[in-house]
Amino acid sequence: MVQTILIPMLLGFSVFMCGMKLMELALHRLAGPYLTGILKRSTATPIHGLAIGTVTTAFLQSSTAVTVIAIGMVNAGLLTFPRTLGIILGTNIGTCITTELIGLNLNKLAVPLLILSIGMWLATALLGELRLFPAVRNARWLPAVRSTSVVLCGFALLLTGMTMMQGVGSAVQDSPMFSWFLGKANESLWWGLAAGALLTAAVHSSAAVIGIIMGFVSIGAMPIELGIAVVLGANIGTCATALLASIGGTKAGQYVAWSHVILNAGGALLFMPFIGELATISEWISSSAAGQIAHTQTIFNILSSLIALPFCYLPTFRRLDPVT
């Protein structure tokens, strides 16, 4: 079990997370100087916050990063608590871009993308160091191209990590622990919800958990309904990082973190009885099992965010705006 499951899974997960962090850091370097200003100026209403939260999360490839930034801005007094509600809903929609890309089965592009990204980075590094082209060396676009090469490298590593993790699917399928879990999940899909929440809270990445589930569903190791339950749980578990980030902050910052939990948990609990319908819709959209999981994640987050959006306009939330 150690050699066939744990070691390959940990290696694949490490490569996947390395790719995710490279993408996040490089994209944050590209957008970082403008992100705080955009969030501050463009979130006057919940619907504006939803739009900005969606775009910034899709660009940064990290809902956690945007949520933590929002909490930090609230703690610093740059944003008020009511203005973050739309941002939180938007991050849930924007994060679907990652799972949709994984669901496209672009694994064959990993090596070409890695070679291309390394070539781009080396070219920009040489142009920046050599004094043969002073005009190019001082060009403003050079750092942007360099950061773009790091983004491509991160995406290539993400695809490589997914391939490695999905490769242990058959070994996991034969393990007694997985058989026990499937038996319990056949009795109640709530086991899948709990597993998704706990695993995502432990690894701090809903994309990694959902990616693994895509692999299991693709090889038939897990039924689509159970996979959807795990996805719903992952949307709850992803709130753990925001809760940790709010510790020691202001009451307003803590309200943001707990609002994230309430909105995500409420949406998951609301859609649990409709897992069969979600599975039917996703099967109608895509014939690929991985694509079905990705589309379910997208449908769930869009619908739950739109359902919750009108409640963000209630006067109650304006009164819940402590100064400290």
Tell me the role of every PLM-derived stretch.
Residues 57-60, 65-92, 99-122, 200-238, ...:
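Membrane-interfacial helix-loop connectors
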Residues 21-29, 70-77, 124-136, 242-250:
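C-terminal ends of transmembrane helices
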Residues 3, 7, 145, 149, ...:
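Alpha-helical transmembrane segments of multi-pass inner-membrane proteins
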Residues 1-50, 144-198, 216-219:
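Helix-loop-helix hairpins and the membrane-proximal interhelical loops
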Residues 22-30, 34, 100, 164-171, ...:
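Membrane-spanning helices that line or support transport/gating and their immediate boundary helices
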Residues 2-8, 85-88, 101-165:
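Signature of multi-pass transmembrane helix bundles
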Residues 20, 24, 98, 203, ...:
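Alpha-helical transmembrane segments of multipass membrane proteins
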Residues 162, 174, 178-182, 253-324:
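Transmembrane alpha-helical segments and their short flanking loops
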